Amino acid sequence: MDLEALKKEAALRSVALVQSGQRVGLGTGSTAKYAIEELGRKLAAGELSGIVGVSTSEASEKLAREVGIPTEPLDPRPLDIAIDGADEIAPNLDLVKGLGGALVREKMTEVQAKRLIIIADHTKLVTRLGEKAPLPIEIVPFGFLSTIERLREFLPGGRLRQPGAQPYVTDNGNYIFDAQLPAEFDARELERRIKGTLGVVDTGLFLGMAERAFVAAPDGVQELTR
C-alpha cells in the first residue's frame, strides 16, 4: 500500500471515532480532506446521522458542502471532536500547524473540541518542533514590517510568506510570517512572547491539544497517544 493510500486509511481510522449526533471540527489540508470525504460518505450511506460540521477554512467549508455535510459557524458551544492534519508532530503530540494558512481558524475551532484527532504521514514526526518546518505566525497587514521587526528581536531570520508579487493572504485577510524556531526553547513561553507582540494574531503552535494521532508510515498506520 502506498503512502497516499495509507493517509486515506489514517483518515478512516479517525472518522471511525465520530458518532451520530456529534458536532465535528473539519480540518484543512490534503490529509484532512480525506476525513471530510469519508464523513460525507458515511452520512450518505446512513452509517452516521445528525452530524454537523464546523469548518476551519473556506476550502473545508466548500468541500463539506460538496460531500453533503451540514455545516454551521463556530459558536461558544463545544465540539465533540475535531479532525485535522499537522505540519510537525512532537513525541508529546505538541504540534506545528498552519503551513496551509488556516492556523487561526483551526486553533479557534479545535480549542473548543473535546477531542482533537490528528492525521498525518510519518514525515511529519519530529523530535522537536521546528526541526523540519517553520512556525507560521499570522499578523495583521497594517504595519506588518514593524511587527516582523519586533518578532525578529527574539526570532532571528524567517520571512513573510509571499508566493508571488504580493504577500499571501489568509481567509481572515491577514499575512503570515514564517519564523525559524531555535534549536532549544520553552514552547509555552515562546508562544506567550509571540502572542504578546503587537500586530500578532496567533501562532501555529498547538500545545497540549491533540489527544491522539493516526500516522501513515511505510509499515502501516500507527496510532500515537498523548
Curated annotation (Swiss-Prot):
NCBIfam families: PRK00702.1 (NF001924), rpiA (TIGR00021)
CDD domains for this protein: RPI_A
Catalytic activity: aldehydo-D-ribose 5-phosphate = D-ribulose 5-phosphate
EC identifiers of the protein: 5.3.1.6
Coiled-coil annotated spans: none
Protein keywords: Isomerase
Keyword Secreted: no
Catalytic residues, chain numbering: 106 (proton acceptor)
Gene3D superfamilies, alphabetized: 3.30.70.260, 3.40.50.1360
Protein name: Ribose-5-phosphate isomerase A
Function description: Catalyzes the reversible conversion of ribose-5-phosphate to ribulose 5-phosphate.
UniProt record similarity statement: Belongs to the ribose 5-phosphate isomerase family.
Species this chain originates from: Deinococcus radiodurans (strain ATCC 13939 / DSM 20539 / JCM 16871 / CCUG 27074 / LMG 4051 / NBRC 15346 / NCIMB 9279 / VKM B-1422 / R1)
Quaternary structure and partners: Homodimer.
InterPro entries per the UniProt record, alphabetical: NagB/RpiA_transferase-like, Ribose-5P_isomerase, Ribose5P_isomerase_typA_subgr, Ribose5P_isomerase_type_A
A molecular-function term among this protein's GO annotations: ribose-5-phosphate isomerase activity
Metabolic or biological pathway: Carbohydrate degradation; pentose phosphate pathway; D-ribose 5-phosphate from D-ribulose 5-phosphate (non-oxidative stage): step 1/1
UniProt-annotated binding residues for substrate: 28-31, 84-87, 97-100, 124
Pfam families: Rib_5-P_isom_A
GO biological process: pentose-phosphate shunt, non-oxidative branch
